[in-house]
Amino acid sequence: MAALSAPGLRSFWILGLRSSVGTAVQAQGVHQSVATDGPSSTQPALPKARAVAPKPSSRGEYVVAKLDDLINWARRSSLWPMTFGLACCAVEMMHMAAPRYDMDRFGVVFRASPRQSDVMIVAGTLTNKMAPALRKVYDQMPEPRYVVSMGSCANGGGYYHYSYSVVRGCDRIVPVDIYIPGCPPTAEALLYGILQLQRKIKRERRLQIWYRR
């Protein structure tokens, strides 16, 4: 019986070896086809490249970038708004200047002269007769200058949107940087708008744009 079973075991072992070799060859062919044809689900996923900020290409560009950061820090830390109260929103603007909110701690100080201001807060309803005065005051402000539209009336006319004597948004007269919704918006909303303006100034790259020209 042992003599009869030995050839059977040998043939079974040979068949198993052939099947394993065939499987290995088939797997190698699959990997080769994947490598030649393109990516597939059988390949392990490659790690994604991390988002890295581009480094300055030269020493001059690096110096200009750091100088830009310094100037932006100085600008956003000393915003001097021009008081341009037109309606009830100006009461909330004055509320922000009161000791409860104390906007001076953010470097925001009201100025009465447009030549000493770099921010204009349009608070209230802008009429057609007041529009030329608004533009004239804006032109007298030194560069860079920013405009904050406070309230629904300044944003788009608000309650008086269909009136014949009201401008439907002060952005038709001057370019606006920050819009503050509300009728009227609270002092907290105005303070939040000022903080958003500071964040916008922080992202400016005026010197870098000038340097790359």
UniProtKB/Swiss-Prot annotation:
Hydroxylated ar Arg-111 by NDUFAF5 early in the pathway of assembly of complex I, before the formation of the juncture between peripheral and membrane arms. Binds 1 [4Fe-4S] cluster. It holds the Pfam family Oxidored_q6. The keyword Nucleotide-binding does not apply. Residues 1-38 form a transit peptide. It catalyses: a ubiquinone + NADH + 5 H(+)(in) = a ubiquinol + NAD(+) + 4 H(+)(out). Its cofactor is [4Fe-4S] cluster. It is a peripheral membrane protein. Its EC number is 7.1.1.2. Residues 33-53 are annotated as: Disordered. Gene3D superfamilies: 3.40.50.12280. InterPro entries: NADH_UbQ_OxRdtase-like_20kDa, NADH_UQ_OxRdtase_20Kd_su. The modification Hydroxyarginine is found at residue 111. Residues 33-44 have a biased composition (Polar residues). It is found in: Mitochondrion inner membrane. GO terms for cellular component: mitochondrial inner membrane; respiratory chain complex I. Belongs to the complex I 20 kDa subunit family. This is NADH dehydrogenase [ubiquinone] iron-sulfur protein 7, mitochondrial. It comes from Pongo abelii. The lineage of its organism: Eukaryota, Metazoa, Chordata, Craniata, Vertebrata.
